[in-house]
Amino acid sequence: MRTSDETRKAHASYALYDAGGRVEASGVADAAAGDEAFTVGSVALDWLDADGLRAADHAVTLDRWPSGRLVVSQLGRRFETFAAAVREARDRARVSGFLAHGLDDPLPFTGAVLEPAPVREARLLLYATHLTVVPKEDDPFQVPYGAVAELRPDAARHALALETAGGAIVLGHVARDTDAFHSALRTRRDAQAKRLADLTGETVFADGQGVARSALHRIDELLRAFAAPERAAGLAALLDPADPPEAVRFGFVELLDLDERLAPAARELPEHFASFLLVPVRGRVILEILAGPSAATYVFEGDIEEINRDLQALRFRRRPLALSGKEAELTPSNPYRLALRKLPALQRLRAAIRARLNHGSGWEAALAKALDGPVG
């Protein structure tokens, strides 16, 4: 629940320090924790640049990226409520900055990350598509439901372990809301899986996780059913160079950055869903969105499992991937600057891009050229 406007304001002393500890600005003024920035006196600190937050000794300290800090003090009786409002506003903005928000309002819980260590208090936000964890003294991160292979109750610690390819994430300290949290998380994950099973008649699909041809005997039928006509025409150019062919992956993802849809596939996709193809080719991986949004063809360098995992963690968001070098500069006006400098999946994927090919005349020749030559 968003805190009220009144709790987000306070009269306070402030001092803005540079990296060397020298005061850049100071005074006594009205402070406000806005939706996009913290403001006090002549200072405005965007939440995307507020990399640290500490509330102690009746002062709120915000670390400023790339250097410096803002200290707000003399809050009196307003300290605790104002500090909580600052934290809530910062968390909300940075969840979006880390691309960990959803299309719906989340169901919130208060708990802790027990593993991986160290134990950290955290807000647990359940969206329709994923869980976002917001540790009190760390950066938020998301866990797509499709990445959770198993939900394992830990009765001894009144906790829940989320088994993923990257290891277990154990969440607990939810107190009397433990059963409600476990039930809500399981319900959302199962609902998403059921939607894909009902769509395809297969139980192997998970949101954002491609299924290998070797595990999906109906892959050719499903490709024809869930590719838009203009993408189906290019399937041969995508599949013929596959090496090894059995490692080709097909899957579905529920998108969070919406776009105009292509002509519908032979079998209609649920709202906000896209179908995708991942093709390994001698150390490279082709990504093709077969139906859903308008999207270019990407060629990455790397392992198909790692590329798929990072795309899933990014929820196949195309806009931050498509940024040019100029557009990706970490300027104050760049809405992706926090993700670009601190989100590992996005950093790895951008570093792995070898080609981004728009569909149209010359697409097939450009794809063949992108797949040619040595890797590395």
What is each of the regions a protein language model found here?
Residues 120-126, 144-145, 149-153:
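Internal, hydrophobic cores of structured domains that mediate oligomerization or house catalytic pockets
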